[in-house]
């Protein structure tokens, strides 16, 4: 890794994470993405929108969003029409993969300034009428839920990801109680971080017009953390396997809206513009295995990222492992031997939310905040994705 050109993160920003059909549901994925990009660039003194040469942005449920959501995000944020834009779909890892692609673009000398991240408005995901083009000639027609079809269903087995989370719980011996207690802890960490203002620096508030003459509303916080009710969480019925199941709605991540962006620069541009770096990208790794085992793919990607970075696992001060389900974090901690005291210290996706195309970038943005708050130096973000994959990234806080 030391032989490759350096890539620096000079800023990061994210929207609040909105609940499904909640406070941010009036905004499209490109509008959310544009807000995150604009906020990230506004943090960098000496860098103009016209300096950005390329944008990589994750988005998963792109039906009805319009052509190339990344391009819409870029132009909506005021970037030049000459900015090259690419939308990335690696399911839940899209946002982190976009950042990896941005770093690679700089390292290969194709750009000096890249914006990367991800966006998703699950509230605005449409339903499909797949047979309408050839005609509904006779009988009932069914709507297909775009969220379920393109976001939450294994394309090979045609089964919900939640059933594969159940498979993970069985494979690795995690009970319903263990998953519930983990979910409660992650909610409590998110609530504590929210109360202490630890998300304030990473969140770019969104002002929304008031309804029917009412005053404008400014959304400043993630919506989900306040919803914790431990008694209800422990009592709710399983979501995927009636009776004997261990995975429930509240010990899984919810459906959400949100976006996150980071600004990446080369060392030459950093020095030329006298920019202040936030962090340095040290390495990354991608991995894949049997699609139904997507839950534990981070346990393959994280070691690859650490090796690429030339960093030992014990040297990492904080990990972000995306909580698609509570059991995902539990299983990967177990497989890698990572203590929970180092993982998702400000809460994870179960409590904060999981706007799928954005989450990879969101966990990196939060990781930078965790390292700053805990006075840590090295951090690693890992996230699984549908189809059996995962992506991971290692950073050094500067």
UniProtKB/Swiss-Prot annotation:
Pathway: Metabolic intermediate biosynthesis; (R)-mevalonate biosynthesis; (R)-mevalonate from acetyl-CoA: step 1/3. It is an enzyme of class 2 (transferase). Chloride binds at residue 385. Activity is increased by monovalent cations such as K(+), Rb(+) or Cs(+). K(+) binds at residues 187, 249-250, 252, 350. It is found in: Cytoplasm, Cytosol. Its cofactor is K(+). GO terms for cellular component: cytosol; mitochondrion. InterPro entries: Thiolase, Thiolase-like, Thiolase_acyl_enz_int_AS, Thiolase_C, Thiolase_CS, Thiolase_N. Its EC number is 2.3.1.9. GO terms for molecular function: acetyl-CoA C-acetyltransferase activity; metal ion binding. The active site is at residues 92, 354, 384. GO terms for biological process: ergosterol biosynthetic process. Its main location: cytoplasm. SUPFAM superfamilies: Thiolase-like. Gene3D superfamilies: 3.40.47.10. Even though it is not involved in catalysis directly, the Cl(-) anion stabilizes the catalytic site via both direct and water-mediated hydrogen bonds to catalytic residues and residues adjacent. Belongs to the thiolase-like superfamily. Thiolase family. Acetyl-CoA acetyltransferase; part of the first module of ergosterol biosynthesis pathway that includes the early steps of the pathway, conserved across all eukaryotes, and which results in the formation of mevalonate from acetyl-coenzyme A (acetyl-CoA). Erg10B catalyzes the formation of acetoacetyl-CoA from acetyl-CoA. The first module starts with the action of the cytosolic acetyl-CoA acetyltransferase erg10B that catalyzes the formation of acetoacetyl-CoA. The hydroxymethylglutaryl-CoA synthases erg13A and erg13B then condense acetyl-CoA with acetoacetyl-CoA to form HMG-CoA. Homotetramer. This is Acetyl-CoA acetyltransferase erg10B, cytosolic. It comes from Aspergillus fumigatus (strain ATCC MYA-4609 / CBS 101355 / FGSC A1100 / Af293) (Neosartorya fumigata).
């Amino acid at each position: 890794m030391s032989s490759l050109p350096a890539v620096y993160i000079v800023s990061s920003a994210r929207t609040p994470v909105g609940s499904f059909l909640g406070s941010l549901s009036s905004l499209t994925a490109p509008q959310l993405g544009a807000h995150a990009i604009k906020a990230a660039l506004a943090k960098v003194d000496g860098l103009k929108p016209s300096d950005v040469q390329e944008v990589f942005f994750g988005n998963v449920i792109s039906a009805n969003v319009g052509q190339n959501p990344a391009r819409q995000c870029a132009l909506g944020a005021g970037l030049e029409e000459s900015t090259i834009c690419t939308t990335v779909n690696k399911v839940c890892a899209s946002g982190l993969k976009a950042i990896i692609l941005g770093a690679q673009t700089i390292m290969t000398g194709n750009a000096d300034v890249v914006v990367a991240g991800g966006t998703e408005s699950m509230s605005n995901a449409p339903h499909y009428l797949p047979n309408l083009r050839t005609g509904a000639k006779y009988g009932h027609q069914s709507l297909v839920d775009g969220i379920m079809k393109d976001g939450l269903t294994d394309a090979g087995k045609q089964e919900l990801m939640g059933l594969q989370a159940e498979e993970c719980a069985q494979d690795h011996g995690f009970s319903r109680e263990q998953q519930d207690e983990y979910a409660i802890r992650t909610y409590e960490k998110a609530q504590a971080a929210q109360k202490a203002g630890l998300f304030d620096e990473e969140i770019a508030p969104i002002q929304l017009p008031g309804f029917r003459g009412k005053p404008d509303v400014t959304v400043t916080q993630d919506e989900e953390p306040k919803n914790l009710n431990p008694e209800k969480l422990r009592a709710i019925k399983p979501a995927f396997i009636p009776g004997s199941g261990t995975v429930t709605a509240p010990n899984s991540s919810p459906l959400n809206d949100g976006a996150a962006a980071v600004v990446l620069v080369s060392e030459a541009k950093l020095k030329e513009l006298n920019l202040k770096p936030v962090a340095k990208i040290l390495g990354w790794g991608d991995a894949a295995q049997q699609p139904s085992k997507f839950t534990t793919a981070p346990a393959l990607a994280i070691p690859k990222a650490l090796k690429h970075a030339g960093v030992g696992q014990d040297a990492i001060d904080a990990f972000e492992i995306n909580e698609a389900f509570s059991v995902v974090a539990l299983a990967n901690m177990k497989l890698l031997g990572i203590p929970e005291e180092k993982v998702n210290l400000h809460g994870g996706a179960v409590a904060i939310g999981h706007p799928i195309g954005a989450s990879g970038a969101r966990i990196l943005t939060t990781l930078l905040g965790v390292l700053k708050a805990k006075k840590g130096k090295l951090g690693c973000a890992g996230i699984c994705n549908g189809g059996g994959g995962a992506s991971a990234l290692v950073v050094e806080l500067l």
